[in-house]
């Protein structure tokens, strides 16, 4: 895992077309802004896990049919 330190207003660049900017820090939370092409899906980890769980359930249902 790459670990980087950024201050508010500073940006990371991922690949050629994704930027992640630190917008603010409040206590133990940070606000980030992400610019990426529409074709790139961006989810919080817990939402991504739910999506994957639903896909797995759907695959099992289709396998049973």
Swiss-Prot record:
Disulfide bonds: none annotated. Pfam families: CsrA (PF02599). It is found in: Cytoplasm. It comes from the Bacteria. GO terms for molecular function: mRNA 5'-UTR binding. Keywords: Activator, Cytoplasm, Repressor, RNA-binding, Translation regulation. InterPro entries: CsrA, CsrA_sf. A key translational regulator that binds mRNA to regulate translation initiation and/or mRNA stability. Mediates global changes in gene expression, shifting from rapid growth to stress survival by linking envelope stress, the stringent response and the catabolite repression systems. Usually binds in the 5'-UTR; binding at or near the Shine-Dalgarno sequence prevents ribosome-binding, repressing translation, binding elsewhere in the 5'-UTR can activate translation and/or stabilize the mRNA. Its function is antagonized by small RNA(s). PANTHER family: CARBON STORAGE REGULATOR (PTHR34984:SF1). Homodimer; the beta-strands of each monomer intercalate to form a hydrophobic core, while the alpha-helices form wings that extend away from the core. This is Translational regulator CsrA. It comes from Blochmanniella floridana.
